[in-house]
Amino acid sequence: MKVTQLLFKNQSLVVSGKDEIEDPLKANLILGFGSKRLVADEQLNSLLTDRYPSAEMLLCSTAGEIAYNSVYDDSAVITVISFEKTTIKIASLNLEGFNDSFELGKSLIQQFDITGLTSILILSDGLLVNGSQLASGMEASNRGNVLITGGLAGDGTLFNNTLVGLNSIPKTGTVAAVGFYGDSIDVRSSSVSGWDVFGPERVVTSANGTDVYEIDNRSAVDLYKIYLGPYIDDKTNSTLLFPLAVKLPGRSHYIARSILSVSHEKNCMIFSGDIPEGSTVRFMKANFEKLIDAADQAAKEISGGDLNYAPELAILISCVGRRIILGKQVEEEVGVVADYFTNKTAIAGFYSYGEISPQMNIGPCQLHNQTMTITTFNEI
């Protein structure tokens, strides 16, 4: 397995990090994370397909790009992979052809032959597609308990629309996936939050999908007015700084759900994923040091305690809310991950509108918010 990293800025591709793959014709896979403007750039698409004609290409818009220990804006981070012993298969569907995101997720996983399938990497539209329904649908078709990880595309802090593409110019509503086959590919994942929870446990008493109307039989909007104060109607995405810890019915662990908006017309809070009635919830707040520690913990967990673990590639997908909180210090959470791996490991990723991975690194994949989620790849 050989990995090349490129940075696309000012209409040119520059090798960043690892050296160029000796034979571009042997490249199997391209992963491109970039600003909406650049991933939809026909020149970039042409440059990549001309340079690596045999490679499958997945492109995804972001809320910031990650390359090694740096975070970029208005760029495209391109990772080119040449597998020596691993087979890949790709699939892509658009929400337009389905009744809901659950059915899309089910159908997407059914595109893959389960025999020899080790893991699947998912890149999804981050606004039109319901991430929690997508994850549930994928797991409904996950016959072999295959590891599924990935993330939801971003649009900076604008939240207008997001783009994903497979071997074509990216567009809205798309979910793309790549499956990895064979015994020679070692894929691992880890997802850690680092947010503090506070206050009593409460129960969601009225909700519909992502819309929460009542908590403890009290208006969720009124309750959040006490919590958020003037931020309740803030137009600068400050609500992203106040996620909700959610324990779904029948589950033992909390997951985070970001607030996307407040609907005074419907008198409800709108979250980034489904929160069913009967869910136990607690308020959350950011702790700068714990966010950084969480990124470090994610890197440590993925090694399984092996201090010599040095994967060829690490994909980092972190939430846009974390980026807003960390501000100018955002590279610190990327840096602690980079410090944990050796120079052998190529690091790429993006800031997302949601992360997809198992809960506590075991079991079915779920939609997460406010986490640092790492997926590593290594041929053995």
Regions found by a protein language model. Name each.
Residues 1-51, 55-56, 60-327, 331-340, ...:
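Small-residue-enriched flexible segments
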Residues 344:
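Short beta-strand/loop segments at the ligand-binding rim of alpha/beta enzyme cores
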